[in-house]
């Protein structure tokens, strides 16, 4: 059994990475690091300053001003702070998805956040999800998983999530946004979305949440020797 281990979960937007990773971390009693939330926090900081997220120079210039903090509440849930203010809810607004995707393609942003992410894995056993965890952030992760589902399935899941938050959007718009983001994330020059050679691919499209979680946990335990 690994004394300290790391689990890297990659996959496209809306594949259920965050929800499943949180549940798996709770079941295993380890820390969950939501890297998407970290990039969304940078995106939110850019948004609040009225900066074009595609303007790499302008975004890089304000990075030193962003006092970004990652901490965990009493329930063990990750919270994000920006300049001392908790922005965990604000960064989940639908428009922040595009901001996160654009700023995450900027080399200066990735360099700015890379050490913060790696430091979490050095400190403790973690499950970390994102787009390039197994290929760039934690290339030596104990377990690498590529979680996926068809765009249509992911759009339906996203619509339900938005409805529960009281911010519903039309299915067609959500699907279009997901397809557009898939293309952008897969074709960007810096750390494009791709499956690590040694990652296990799990397609949850036809599975319930409980079935998906069971499959994920079984894979982690087998690969990590738990």
What residue spans do the PLM features occupy?
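Extreme N-terminal, non-catalytic leader segments
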Residues: 1-6
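Hydrophobic anchor at the beta1->P-loop junction of P-loop NTPases
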Residues: 9
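P-loop (Walker A) phosphate-binding loop of NTP-binding proteins
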Residues: 12
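Conserved lysine of the Walker
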Residues: 17
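Hydrophobic positions on the alpha1 helix immediately C-terminal to the Walker A/P-loop
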Residues: 20
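N-terminal phosphate/diphosphate-binding loop that engages ATP/GTP or pyrophosphate donors
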Residues: 27-92
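Small-molecule kinase domains that catalyze NTP-dependent phosphoryl transfer to phosphate-bearing small molecules
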Residues: 72, 117-124, 134-136, 140, ...
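ATP-dependent NMP and nucleoside kinases share a basic, alpha-helical "lid"
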Residues: 88-167
């Amino acid at each position: 059994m690994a004394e300290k281990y790391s689990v890297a979960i990659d996959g496209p937007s809306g594949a259920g990475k965050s929800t499943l990773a949180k549940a798996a971390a709770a079941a295993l009693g380890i820390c969950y690091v939501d890297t998407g939330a970290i990039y969304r926090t940078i995106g939110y900081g850019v948004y609040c300053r009225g900066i074009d997220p595609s303007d790499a120079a302008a975004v890089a210039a304000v990075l030193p001003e962003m006092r970004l903090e990652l901490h965990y509440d009493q329930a063990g849930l990750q919270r994000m702070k920006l300049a001392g203010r908790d922005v965990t809810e604000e960064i989940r607004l639908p428009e922040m998805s595009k901001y996160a995707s654009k700023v995450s393609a900027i080399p200066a942003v990735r360099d700015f956040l890379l050490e913060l992410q790696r430091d979490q894995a050095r400190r403790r056993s973690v499950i970390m999800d994102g787009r390039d965890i197994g290929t760039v952030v934690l290339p030596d992760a104990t377990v690498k998983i590529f979680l996926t589902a068809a765009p249509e399935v992911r759009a339906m899941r996203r619509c339900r999530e938005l409805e529960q938050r009281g911010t519903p959007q039309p299915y067609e718009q959500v699907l279009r946004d997901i397809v557009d983001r898939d293309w952008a994330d897969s074709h960007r020059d810096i750390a494009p979305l791709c499956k690590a050679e040694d990652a296990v691919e799990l397609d949850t499209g036809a599975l319930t949440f409980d079935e998906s979680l069971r499959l994920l946990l079984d894979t982690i335990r087998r690969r990590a020797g738990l």
